[in-house]
Amino acid sequence: MKTLLLTLVVVTIVCLDLGYTLKCNKLVPIASKTCPAGKNLCYKMFMMSDLTVPVKRGCIDVCPKSSLLVKYVCCNTDICN
């Protein structure tokens, strides 16, 4: 009985992702990637001259401040960018 219980615990640990992993879109929205440890935000970067087309997408640790030329939009849920 102990062996069966131990086996179930090991299988559960192996099958489950014990740490939360964030997924963010790459530049092409249909392609996503799993963010590395410490990168807990997704972002989109736009040129201020054209706010309709993102220039860059990905994972980031801290959301940068927007400037006169570039706007950043950050979020923290899977594929939110």
Curated annotation (Swiss-Prot):
Q: What role does it play? A: Shows cytolytic activity on many different cells by forming pore in lipid membranes. In vivo, increases heart rate or kills the animal by cardiac arrest. In addition, it binds to heparin with high affinity, interacts with Kv channel-interacting protein 1 (KCNIP1) in a calcium-independent manner, and binds to integrin alpha-V/beta-3 (ITGAV/ITGB3) with moderate affinity.
Q: Which SUPFAM superfamilies match?
A: Snake toxin-like (SSF57302)
An example of a GO molecular function for this protein is:
toxin activity
What assembly does the database describe for this protein? Monomer in solution; Homodimer and oligomer in the presence of negatively charged lipids forming a pore with a size ranging between 20 and 30 Angstroms.
Tissue-level expression reads:
Expressed by the venom gland.
Any one GO BP annotation for this protein: killing of cells of another organism
What is the name of this protein? Cytotoxin 1b
Instruction: Note the PROSITE patterns from the entry.
Output: SNAKE_TOXIN
Tell me the keywords, alphabetical order. Answer: Cardiotoxin, Cytolysis, Disulfide bond, Membrane, Secreted, Signal, Target cell membrane, Target membrane, Toxin
* Cystine crosslinks: C24-C42, C35-C59, C63-C74, C75-C80
Question: Which stretch is the leader sequence?
Answer: 1-21
**Where on the tree of life does the source sit, at the highest rank?**
Eukaryota
Q: Which family does it belong to?
A: Belongs to the three-finger toxin family. Short-chain subfamily. Type IA cytotoxin sub-subfamily.
